[in-house]
Amino acid sequence: MQVYAVGGAIRDELLGKPSQDRDYVVVGATPAQMEAAGYKPVGKDFPVFLHPRTKEEYALARTERKTAMGYKGFAFYCEPDVTLEDDLVRRDLTINAMARAVDADGNLTGPVIDPHGGQRDLAARLFRHVSDAFAEDPVRILRVARFAARFHEFGVAAETMRLMREMVAAGEVDALVPERVWQELARGLMEAKPSRMFEVLRECGALARLLPELERLWGVPQRADYHPEIDTGVHVMMVIDQAAAMGAPLTVRFAALVHDLGKGTTPADVLPRHIGHESRSAQLLEDVCVRLRVPNECRDLALVVAREHGNIHRSQEFSAAAVMRLLERCDALRKPARFAEALQACEADLRGRKGFESSAYPQAARLLAALEAAAAVDAGAIARACGDDVGQIRDRVQAARVAAVAARIGG
């Protein structure tokens, strides 16, 4: 049998980028031969094995045939007569359909095997599908969009974009399971320029099917004095790119993505104002989170940011009592780390505006100082001092916290 490293590891080597892991394909072997060599079977849908020493995954070369809609609708053939070329032709993009042989020590040997012009497309900075079999797996639309967020200087070949549009029109993306959609969106949000993912999804029509709440933001105007970029969709893309530039975690990036969904439902006769968009945003994102089965930690932070980002922006003008009420609505005393992430999302929101990219955000330091002061109040001591008058405990703790906040930040 012969082992090859395939896909991303070869692509990244040619780009001079580090590769986090390698994918291996084994040609000319049976499952029994792999187990006899010490490999442990782990694949459910097709034969995948763990290397006895490195624990890396090795898959038998395979072909696949479409049997139903969606990304699970495939039958696989994994016999020893499947060649490397047979395996590579089923892959999504030419830049991911290259291979190099691997020796017994795991070292890459020999030339790059590139039957589909992957090196040509790397040089041209293009995402191009290998064959029309691309259309059989709708997840590939999401993967192309995610790759665009990682390799943001790349474009999508015209024929590939045309095929993606045909897939969307045929309803292929409608068959995707929510968990897989979320997985790909989350991975794309964590790339260097997540806005590119959504640009590609918009261009092929998939965003309107997967996230219509986000799609409808494009073309919705905002007040030019607050948003020189005007267009709400453009603003949100600037915000998620700012969150990425700040190195923010997924929770913050998702909150940045969905914080203004309510602006897409603002009545036309009140534009470009968006009165009450915060509560509408919260309702819409709850629907999104249910539909895509978004993790609770992402949903919870996004709800805080959607509801309170306007107040957080204005908090420099707040009295100590108003700041304390804001902290309570955000549950900041019980969840200070989440509150810090909310402030990071709000900072990205401010900077995600034309001309504001390098602006300071003093609101964050002031509110964190207020939170620190409020948290230092000994609520237990106050409760004990109240004795049997338990009805006074809440009011006295609140008064002590407001006084502590006022002493720290004024007001």
UniProtKB/Swiss-Prot annotation:
One Pfam family hit: HD
Disulfide bonds: none
One GO BP: tRNA 3'-terminal CCA addition
Domain HD, residue spans: 232-333
Note describing how the cofactor binds: Magnesium is required for nucleotidyltransferase activity. Nickel for phosphatase activity.
Record-listed Mg(2+) binding positions: D21, D23
Annotated domain remarks: Comprises two domains: an N-terminal domain containing the nucleotidyltransferase activity and a C-terminal HD domain associated with both phosphodiesterase and phosphatase activities.
Family of the protein in this entry: Belongs to the tRNA nucleotidyltransferase/poly(A) polymerase family. Bacterial CCA-adding enzyme type 1 subfamily.
Name the record gives this protein: Multifunctional CCA protein
Organism: Cupriavidus necator (strain ATCC 17699 / DSM 428 / KCTC 22496 / NCIMB 10442 / H16 / Stanier 337)
Gene name linked to the record: cca
